[in-house]
Amino acid sequence: MEALVYTFLLIGTLMVIFFAVFFRDTPRILKK
């Protein structure tokens, strides 16, 4: 059960980082 919780936290952290980078780089992509 603990493994499932740690996996969920890991995926959640990766998604947060991904969206943070994606939204941060979006203005530059749109300017191109």
Swiss-Prot record:
Keywords, sorted A to Z: Chloroplast, Membrane, Photosynthesis, Photosystem II, Plastid, Thylakoid, Transmembrane, Transmembrane helix
One GO location term (cellular component): chloroplast thylakoid membrane
Residue stretches spanning the membrane: 3-23
One Pfam family named in its UniProt record: PsbT
Record's bilayer topology term: Single-pass membrane protein
GO biological process, one term: photosynthesis
Location of the protein in the cell: Plastid, Chloroplast thylakoid membrane
Cross-referenced SUPFAM superfamilies: Photosystem II reaction center protein T, PsbT
Main location: plastid
Domain of life: Eukaryota
Quaternary state and interactors: PSII is composed of 1 copy each of membrane proteins PsbA, PsbB, PsbC, PsbD, PsbE, PsbF, PsbH, PsbI, PsbJ, PsbK, PsbL, PsbM, PsbT, PsbX, PsbY, PsbZ, Psb30/Ycf12, at least 3 peripheral proteins of the oxygen-evolving complex and a large number of cofactors. It forms dimeric complexes.
Entry-linked HAMAP family: PSII_PsbT (MF_00808)
Role this protein plays: Found at the monomer-monomer interface of the photosystem II (PS II) dimer, plays a role in assembly and dimerization of PSII. PSII is a light-driven water plastoquinone oxidoreductase, using light energy to abstract electrons from H(2)O, generating a proton gradient subsequently used for ATP formation.
Name of the protein described by the UniProt record: Photosystem II reaction center protein T
Gene: psbT
